[in-house]
């Protein structure tokens, strides 16, 4: 498999190249960006954030020690860029030393210190906070202040992703604010005055259910030309799209299905901008129950392989999600650094699928056309969440394809909380799911190995050979050798067919044409917003800073 490389600049609009942002007092290229968003964050405090919109907002207020460049591999130490730390060096195989940016200050004017870094790592590791990143920090990384501007990170074991673990998961918090508040009370703390970071934007106001506003911080150097960032909250994707179509918003992260994209494309005020997504979708089979009893139908690998052969994945992916959607080579998005691009997966071959079922004893009987093996019909259910019309469309398309193969398939649509409860309890035959990748391939361990049973591996797939390959790949320090091991693991999981890997999305954003210097980072689409500008000749009334 060929290792695909994503360019360091995720996407740059050709029409937006030119001069760098200015910071003069006149600021003719300054203004406001309004973002249409579906839903709103439950919190902005980074250790408690689980929604992508909360991350998008928080990452403009708070900073990491360093940033991974778009397209960079977590094992590549040259792919990291200074952020709150101006430099770092390796001390030994278990230790990294970071030097904080000279003059770094919190937005209330207090200096950022190594003590803040120590405090932040401790908070992320605390079971009381139970941050999403806690498994990567607790018992694995210890922060020690060497002086006020130098911090040493000590790791429990060697790993090629130490720099990634030291910088990607933790946003640095002000100890002088949060250290005085019991951690058990953090989630209930609603004091917006506590939302103080060291990043380029400061919190300004939040009208719950309506909007949230950030303002460029005067201490930032250079001060961003986009002086105000406003999120307009919509209850559903249609309402968010309407904010674009009525010109009330400048940006929409994901327009959606092809028919929706065509509506925006017809509006001359906006660019329609495709860029790779970190999302991949799949249909997962339940191979066994909690007691180890194989599923009467889907526990048979011949059935799973036949169902995979009978699914025209390229057609399904592009007809439902639009051009640019790929069929992944395994459980990964287009962005994961080990991705080999659009392979088409296992070839679409309905004749081969039928022969495979025949040879495994699943034969058509009677006038129904439904296959049976003994008294067991080839019958199962596909569970989908009501919150995703596209996943429902995927399930219905597969249902029809498998009906022609001789399978009796029912599609069950349930509310989101019920969907999650049934997955956790193992009360399903199969389900259409989607995962959001992070840059590291280690998420595969939680999703598809034996250690993920009771966690994200709802289908209870477990192959020691696959688990071993992932473990070896995660310990390998050489990028190419690591990728080769991951690819061998993908060949193994595809042969076992515990799931059908259906689509790796391409996002399509709506971007107002007056915006300049736009670069969209697929892992954090607003990360470069502090460097954006407004075309002076195209300024709108909302760009006024008065």
Predicted regions and their residues:
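Sec-dependent bacterial lipoprotein signal peptides
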Residues: 1-14
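Extracytoplasmic/periplasmic ligand-capture domains
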Residues: 16-27, 101-133, 143-145, 192-195, ...
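A short glycine/threonine-centered beta-strand motif
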Residues: 37, 61, 98-101, 155
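N-terminal lobe/hinge region of extracytoplasmic solute-binding protein
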Residues: 36-92, 122, 194-198
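Active-site-proximal polar cores
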Residues: 502
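Long beta-strand-rich cores associated with HINT superfamily self-processing modules
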Residues: 509-546
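Surface-exposed binding/hinge segments that line
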Residues: 89, 133-180
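Short, solvent-exposed loop/turn elements at domain surfaces
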Residues: 41-48, 73-76, 161-164, 212-213, ...
